[in-house]
């Protein structure tokens, strides 16, 4: 119960849902590594950016109910299910890059864009000042019914808590960056929002490249 480090014993990788099949999972149970996360949704299973588990990786698991974890005997072809995709960012946001291993602490934020028509190829990044601390791409592949895109983001910091973080959104259709007024105070191992109830961005601070101020229309 609570956060526990778990190793991955099988010789081959496998999908997260299958790997954690023996756990008595409940709504909101959470798995993460340094790069991605997955959350348990009652009736749907594990879903998130951490779609598979692999040998050599370490994981943090947070569960409400204590239970035993026995990994399946995965075959080599199961490891092929692990998705390794090199994402090439649009040139306008090519500097939105973060090295997860450069920071001591991390946390998870699931976001939505509530005042824009977003879609495939869009991104949300989180910043401490001008330094990118995490980035996530639009996705709508969740297993439940819905019509809202979400962004599953890992945020990083060298401070265990208290660092102020801000958001920028890239709209690929308009090739436009929008700066939002919402902020989050970083806390190590935080879990903000989820796929069914994301943290919504709606208060525009300014839009690039014009960088005109919209404070009258969207007060802080």
Model-derived features: where do they sit?
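Glycine-centered coil/turn sites that cap beta-strands in beta-rich domains
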Residues: 206-218
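Asparagine-centered polar/low-complexity signal
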Residues: 4, 217-220
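N-terminal exported-region signature
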Residues: 1-199
């Amino acid at each position: 119960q609570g956060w526990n480090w778990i190793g991955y014993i099988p010789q081959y990788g496998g999908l997260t849902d299958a790997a954690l099949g023996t756990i008595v999972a409940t709504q909101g149970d959470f798995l993460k590594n340094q790069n991605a996360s997955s959350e348990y949704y009652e009736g749907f299973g594990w879903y998130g950016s951490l779609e598979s588990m692999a040998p050599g990786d370490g994981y943090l698991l947070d569960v409400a109910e204590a239970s035993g974890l026995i990994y399946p005997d995965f075959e080599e072809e199961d490891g092929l299910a692990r998705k390794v995709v090199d994402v090439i960012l649009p040139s306008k946001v090519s500097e939105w890059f973060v090295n997860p291993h450069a920071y001591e602490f991390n946390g998870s934020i699931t976001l939505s864009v509530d005042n824009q028509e977003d879609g495939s190829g869009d991104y949300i990044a989180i910043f401490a000042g001008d330094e990118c601390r995490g980035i996530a791409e639009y996705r709508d592949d969740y297993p439940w019914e819905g019509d809202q895109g979400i962004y599953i983001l890992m945020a990083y910091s060298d401070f265990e808590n208290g660092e102020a973080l801000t958001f920028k959104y890239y709209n690929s259709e308009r090739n436009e960056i929008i700066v939002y007024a919402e902020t989050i105070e970083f806390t190590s191992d935080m879990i903000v929002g989820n796929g069914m109830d994301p943290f919504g961005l709606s208060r525009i601070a300014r839009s690039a490249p014009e960088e005109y101020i919209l404070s009258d229309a969207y007060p802080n």
